[in-house]
């Protein structure tokens, strides 16, 4: 049996993943972070992005909305603000959120919080990517 690393992805609401995996790629704030079994200890911040991992040659995707990652021992723990597996994502809802964010950014009226609209657009695009729709 090949070496595995334990992956736990947790949000305030639920445990999204709890399994032994071959490899993890996480969206760090400075770029992607690749983690193999027996990785050196690490704590880092995560950005909005796709967490990818492989199990028995199959790649799984989880859309993250930021958070923190810790590698300790032979375990990766992701504490995420929000996380959804690709197959759980409501694609129509994500597309509507993307359209709303783009409309707000196009208007750019004084009452629009541009940063909030940009973050909403990034989250919607990320969810669509995780669902395989982009």
UniProtKB/Swiss-Prot annotation:
Gene3D superfamilies: ATP synthase delta/epsilon subunit, C-terminal domain, F0F1 ATP synthase delta/epsilon subunit, N-terminal. GO terms for cellular component: plasma membrane; proton-transporting ATP synthase complex. One of its GO terms (molecular function) is ATP binding. It holds the Pfam family ATP-synt_DE. InterPro entries: ATP_F1_dsu/esu_C_sf, ATP_synth_F1_dsu/esu, ATP_synth_F1_dsu/esu_N, ATP_synth_F1_esu_C, ATPsynth_dsu/esu_N. It comes from the Bacteria. It is a peripheral membrane protein. Keywords: ATP synthesis, Cell membrane, CF(1), Hydrogen ion transport, Ion transport, Membrane, Transport. It is found in: Cell membrane. Belongs to the ATPase epsilon chain family. F-type ATPases have 2 components, CF(1) - the catalytic core - and CF(0) - the membrane proton channel. CF(1) has five subunits: alpha(3), beta(3), gamma(1), delta(1), epsilon(1). CF(0) has three main subunits: a, b and c. NCBIfam families: ATP_synt_epsi, PRK00571.1-3, PRK13446.1. Produces ATP from ADP in the presence of a proton gradient across the membrane. This is ATP synthase epsilon chain. The gene is atpC.
